[in-house]
Amino acid sequence: MDEKTIEKIKKEAEEIINKFSEVLEKFNLEMEESYYIIDTRNVLREDEAVESNPEFREKFLKIAPKVNKEGYVVVEKGSWLK
């Protein structure tokens, strides 16, 4: 780039900074922040006890790849684990 272009870019950048500074001066940046502690974990609905579905275990074990004699799912340990 030539010297003229560099000076033009510097001048435009300075104008942008000046305009931005003018806008910032209109805001009160010295105000205090407010913090809120919310005890409610689920604000969309009431928490209720979960009902278990007795058919779930049976259906789950049907689609499991391998189940032992006690009725537990047998899984392969990841090769990346020691």
Swiss-Prot record:
In terms of superkingdom, the source organism counts as Archaea
SUPFAM superfamilies to which the protein is assigned, alphabetical: Glu-tRNAGln amidotransferase C subunit
Q: What is its EC number?
A: 6.3.5.-
* Pfam family name, one: GatC
Swiss-Prot/TrEMBL keywords: ATP-binding, Ligase, Nucleotide-binding, Protein biosynthesis
Catalytic activity reads: L-glutamyl-tRNA(Gln) + L-glutamine + ATP + H2O = L-glutaminyl-tRNA(Gln) + L-glutamate + ADP + phosphate + H(+); L-aspartyl-tRNA(Asn) + L-glutamine + ATP + H2O = L-asparaginyl-tRNA(Asn) + L-glutamate + ADP + phosphate + 2 H(+)
GO terms assigned for molecular function: asparaginyl-tRNA synthase (glutamine-hydrolyzing) activity; ATP binding; glutaminyl-tRNA synthase (glutamine-hydrolyzing) activity
In the record, biological process GO terms are: regulation of translational fidelity; translation
Q: How does it assemble?
A: Heterotrimer of A, B and C subunits.
* Family under the similarity heading: Belongs to the GatC family.
Q: What does this protein do?
A: Allows the formation of correctly charged Asn-tRNA(Asn) or Gln-tRNA(Gln) through the transamidation of misacylated Asp-tRNA(Asn) or Glu-tRNA(Gln) in organisms which lack either or both of asparaginyl-tRNA or glutaminyl-tRNA synthetases. The reaction takes place in the presence of glutamine and ATP through an activated phospho-Asp-tRNA(Asn) or phospho-Glu-tRNA(Gln).
Q: What is this protein called?
A: Probable glutamyl-tRNA(Gln) amidotransferase subunit C
Organism, scientific name: Methanocaldococcus jannaschii (strain ATCC 43067 / DSM 2661 / JAL-1 / JCM 10045 / NBRC 100440) (Methanococcus jannaschii)
Q: From which lineage does this chain's organism come?
A: Archaea, Methanobacteriati, Methanobacteriota, Methanomada group, Methanococci
